[in-house]
């Protein structure tokens, strides 16, 4: 409560300052750019990072590429295409993560009124850790999408045993990827939503909604901040709190069917939550 009260005080001070800014001033221009990209999160980010620095880390465009995305690519170029690399060297968390994901998925697929088991899409797939252990045992075919070609090349070796069920590998950043219309029973998005701006996450979730078959669902699994929004400078990602995340989900035209906190992770870890989402057209 103390944090939220301090944030609202900060919000009021900033909005008053913003109202008084010259519409042609540098501060107004930078603020407008950040607010456009992080409309749900930007005031939390401005609490911790000065305006000019935040702009340089996120919304500034250099050589046609937004720095928030360019810096993430640089980070992942140094990540090895291994399970350890996919888990950020916390390989001991892979097993409880997989077990919880398998259990959560079973609640929403198979049977009347549930998602089918024909085709799934693994978003931000990396080498295919989730595909191998969670999706391929359930679905007739799986597709992978990731921005790193090196990860997708390794995925073909990593998934070799079940490779005949892998329909295709898409080398795209998620902000540039559009799932084919009504193709998937399940779209799995894990530990990658924080690499999208608020604007692009909202748009991507909307496109994923259109990519679902009848009764199809989206599984969103990610770190959820306890309060506000946190920018990780090391990998250029944001961790949003529950209110911010659910607001973006709602605005994308999706409804939360169920949510569950990941068990078995150390207390000092940022909480991880799983959400099952479907189109509000089915509500």
From Swiss-Prot:
Keyword Nucleus attributed: yes
Catalytic EC class: transferase
Domain of life: Eukaryota
Pfam families: Methyltransf_PK
Gene Ontology cellular component list: cytoplasm; nucleus
Record keywords: Methyltransferase, Nucleus, S-adenosyl-L-methionine, Transferase
Enzyme Commission no: 2.1.1.299
SUPFAM superfamilies recorded: S-adenosyl-L-methionine-dependent methyltransferases
Gene3D superfamilies found in the cross-reference section: Vaccinia Virus protein VP39
InterPro entries (UniProt xref): MeTrfase_NTM1 (IPR008576), SAM-dependent_MTases_sf (IPR029063)
Primary location class: nucleus
Reaction it catalyzes: N-terminal L-alanyl-L-prolyl-L-lysyl-[protein] + S-adenosyl-L-methionine = N-terminal N-methyl-L-alanyl-L-prolyl-L-lysyl-[protein] + S-adenosyl-L-homocysteine + H(+); N-terminal L-prolyl-L-prolyl-L-lysyl-[protein] + S-adenosyl-L-methionine = N-terminal N-methyl-L-prolyl-L-prolyl-L-lysyl-[protein] + S-adenosyl-L-homocysteine + H(+); N-terminal L-seryl-L-prolyl-L-lysyl-[protein] + S-adenosyl-L-methionine = N-terminal N-methyl-L-seryl-L-prolyl-L-lysyl-[protein] + S-adenosyl-L-homocysteine + H(+)
Compartments, as annotated in UniProt: Nucleus
A GO biological-process term: N-terminal protein amino acid methylation
Binding, S-adenosyl-L-methionine: 124, 129, 146, 174-175, 190, 195
Listed CDD domains: AdoMet_MTases
Keyword Ribonucleoprotein included in the entry's annotation: no
An example molecular function term from Gene Ontology annotations: N-terminal protein N-methyltransferase activity
Function: Alpha N-methyltransferase that methylates the N-terminus of target proteins containing the N-terminal motif [Ala/Pro/Ser]-Pro-Lys when the initiator Met is cleaved. Specifically catalyzes monomethylation of exposed alpha-amino group of Ala or Ser residue in the [Ala/Ser]-Pro-Lys motif and Pro in the Pro-Pro-Lys motif. Predominantly functions as a mono-methyltransferase but is also able to di-/tri-methylate the GPKRIA peptide and di-methylate the PPKRIA peptide (in vitro). May activate NTMT1 by priming its substrates for trimethylation.
Stated family: Belongs to the methyltransferase superfamily. NTM1 family.
Listed name of the protein: N-terminal Xaa-Pro-Lys N-methyltransferase 2
Gene: NTMT2
């Amino acid at each position: 409560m103390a944090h939220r009260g301090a944030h609202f005080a900060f919000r009021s001070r900033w909005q008053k300052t913003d109202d008084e800014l010259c519409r042609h001033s540098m501060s107004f221009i930078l603020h407008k750019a950040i607010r456009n990209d992080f409309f749900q999160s930007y005031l939390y980010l401005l609490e911790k990072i000065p305006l000019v620095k935040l702009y340089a880390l996120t919304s500034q465009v250099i050589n046609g590429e937004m720095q928030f995305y360019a810096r993430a690519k640089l980070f992942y170029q140094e990540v090895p295409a291994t399970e350890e690399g996919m888990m950020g060297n916390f390989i001991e968390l892979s097993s409880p993560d997989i077990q919880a994901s398998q259990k959560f998925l079973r609640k929403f697929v198979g049977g009347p009124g549930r998602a089918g088991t024909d085709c799934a899409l693994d978003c931000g797939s990396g080498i295919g850790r989730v595909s191998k252990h969670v999706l391929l045992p359930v679905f007739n075919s799986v597709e992978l999408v990731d921005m790193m070609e090196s990860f997708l090349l390794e995925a073909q070796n990593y998934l070799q045993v079940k490779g005949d069920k892998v329909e295709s590998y898409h080398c795209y950043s998620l902000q540039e990827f559009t799932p084919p219309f009504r193709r998937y029973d399940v779209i799995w998005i894990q530990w990658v939503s924080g690499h999208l701006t608020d604007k692009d996450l909202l748009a991507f979730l909307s496109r994923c909604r259109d990519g679902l078959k009848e009764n199809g669902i989206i599984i969103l699994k990610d770190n959820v901040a306890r309060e506000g929004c946190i920018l990780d400078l090391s990998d250029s990602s944001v961790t949003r709190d529950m209110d911010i995340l659910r607001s973006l989900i709602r605005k994308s035209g999706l409804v939360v069917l169920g949510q569950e906190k990941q068990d078995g992770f150390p207390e000092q870890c940022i909480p991880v939550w799983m959400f099952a989402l479907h189109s509000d057209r089915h509500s």
